[in-house]
Amino acid sequence: ESMGRNLMASPYAGTIVAIEALVSSASEQQKSEWLPKIVEGAIATMAITESDGSWDLSQIEAMGTVIGDRLSLHGSKCFVTDADCAEFMVASIRLDDEVKLVMIRRDEIPDNAIIREIVIDQTRRSFQVQLDGIEIPLSQVLPKSDLKAIELAAMLMLCAEISGGLVGVLHSIVEYLNTRKAFDRYIGSYQSLKHPAVDILLRLEAMRSHLYHAATNLANNDAPAAEIALRMAKAHGAEAFAFAGDRAVQFHGGFGFTFECDAQLYLRRALWCQYQFGDEKYHR
């Protein structure tokens, strides 16, 4: 939440989701090899979104072909955050008509296979990764493929970021409403500006309740209840964050449309979060 509130550009979320992928799907030998590296400071990321941007993680086009004791990869992944600096990534592929997760080291990926994407939020270092021609040892194939655990972990991190972002943008709005004067009155005294600010606060509290409920259920290993709460949090929070970002830009007037105003940064982050792992219509 604090990272979202301050619009922190960090590989933290991707690394945490990669940890969840290892914990839920890797063998004990793989865990003992990869998890200590993360503890020591290694950056990891996830490559689970196909080139068509599908929100269904089971719809996988990337393929793997076994050649001796190695696996040849084909296809591409998009929206891979921090791919250029991650020491390894967890990617989803289809192998013998089964969904598999594989570990790919950074030194196994050619530099020209990592392409920076132009996205609405440039604080997000998003890349497309071309898998064609990449070969990895079969020992880097995870024995399980718990996509549901990965999705829940990713949505929890994303919803926490949305919750923090709502706090940050609301503070930005309130500060400006209590600073800017028009016709010798603070603009925050006008009803047309006060009411949307209150609406944002109410949406924030509702979304945060869903988020904390989901986190509690995950901690208690109640995945079905956690999924319901997370979908409610994502649907409610993504819509609220986009609305709050838009109001922040509008309330700041012409200044809000410039790069010098932080309001546009919140709007960009809101639009990025809104379409990660499904928008509000998808989850409802």
Regions inferred by a protein language model and the residue ranges of each:
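A short core secondary-structure module
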Residues: 76-113
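Alpha-helical interface subdomain recognition
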Residues: 1-3, 25-28, 37, 41, ...
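Internal helix-loop-helix
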Residues: 1-41, 82-88
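Active-site beta-strand/loop segments that form the cofactor-binding cradle
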Residues: 1-13, 47-51, 70, 76-78, ...
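Short beta-strand-to-turn element immediately C-terminal to the catalytic PLP-Schiff-base lysine
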Residues: 23-26, 65, 91-94, 103-106, ...
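A gly/ser-rich beta-alpha-beta helix-loop segment of oxidoreductase catalytic cores
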Residues: 43-66
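Flexible, small-/acidic-enriched active-site or ligand-binding loops
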Residues: 61, 79-80, 106-140, 144-146
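A generic structural signal for well-ordered coil/turn residues at beta-strand boundaries
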Residues: 18, 42, 56-60, 84-87, ...
